[in-house]
Regions:
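Catalytic palm active-site di-aspartate
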Residues: 41-42, 83, 154-166
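Hydrophobic alpha-helix feature that most strongly marks membrane-spanning transmembrane helices
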Residues: 88, 146-153, 177
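Polymerase palm active-site segment centered on the conserved acidic dipeptide of motif C
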Residues: 169-179
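Short, basic interhelical loop/turn and adjoining N-cap
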Residues: 73-74, 167-171
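Non-catalytic nucleic-acid-binding interfaces of large nucleic-acid enzymes and RNP effectors
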Residues: 1-27
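Helical catalytic core of nucleic-acid polymerases
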Residues: 17-128, 132-134
Length: 179
C-alpha cells in the first residue's frame, strides 16, 4: 500500500496480520494446514536496514542491547521506543516529544542519542526513515513469500515478520536472511 511515492514508502498489508494477537492470542494460535505456526521477525530492522542499505554496515547481533549498555539504559523497550521514534521523526524535537509519551525523559533521550552516535556514527536519526524501511521490509517479505510459494511452503506476512508452519521456521530464518 503506497500513500505517496512507491519508490520510497509503502507497506505490505494483509488480512492475516490484522487478526488480534495482544489481548486475544488469535493470530499466533492460527493453524496453517492443521499445524501450529511460528512468527519469525526481523530484529531492530529499521536500524539494520539503514546501516546495511545506506552504509554497507552490519549492526551486530544485539543492537538494542548494545545501545542500552552504552547509554546506561538497560530497558530494551525504552531503547526500541527511542529508535522507532528517532528514526521515524523528521526532526529531533518531534522525536523527543514522541519519546516523552513512552516515558523517555530528555536525559534518557540524550543518553540514547549519544550511544547511537558512538556505536553507529553513520546512523541517521530524525530523517523520517520509517517509510523507506517499511517499503524495503515489504519487498523483502514479498521475496520470502514467493520463495515459499516456489518451495511449497505457506508463508504469511505480518508487518516485519512472516508466519510459517513451525516445522519451517528455520527455512524462514534462512530465507529472510538471504532476501
Amino acid at each position: 500500500l503506497y500513500k505517496g511515492d512507491p519508490f520510497s514508502e509503502g507497506r505490505l498489508y494483509t488480512s492475516f496480520q490484522n487478526l488480534p494477537d495482544r489481548l486475544a492470542r488469535v493470530r499466533i494460535n492460527t493453524l496453517i494446514d492443521g499445524e501450529p505456526i511460528a512468527e519469525i521477525d526481523f530484529n531492530a530492522n529499521h536500524l539494520r536496514l539503514q546501516l546495511a542499505v545506506l552504509h554497507q554496515q552490519d549492526a551486530g547481533h544485539t543492537p538494542y542491547e548494545d545501545i542500552g549498555a552504552a547509554s546506561g539504559i538497560n530497558d530494551r523497550q525504552s531503547v526500541k521506543a527511542f529508535i522507532t521514534r528517532a528514526m521515524g521523526a523528521d526532526n529531533r524535537d518531534a522525536a523527543m516529544n514522541s519519546c516523552k509519551t513512552e516515558g523517555i525523559t530528555n536525559v534518557m533521550f540524550e543518553a540514547l542519542e549519544a550511544a547511537c552516535a558512538k556505536l553507529y556514527p553513520d546512523l541517521k536519526l530524525f530523517i523520517g526513515w520509517t517509510h523507506q524501511a517499511q517499503n524495503l521490509e515489504g519487498q523483502i517479505l514479498k521475496k520470502v513469500m514467493l520463495q515459499g510459494l516456489d518451495e511449497g511452503i505457506v508463508c504469511l506476512p505480518v508487518h516485519d515478520a512472516v508466519a510459517v508452519p513451525k516445522r519451517h521456521q528455520f527455512w524462514a530464518v534462512k530465507t529472510m536472511m538471504r532476501a
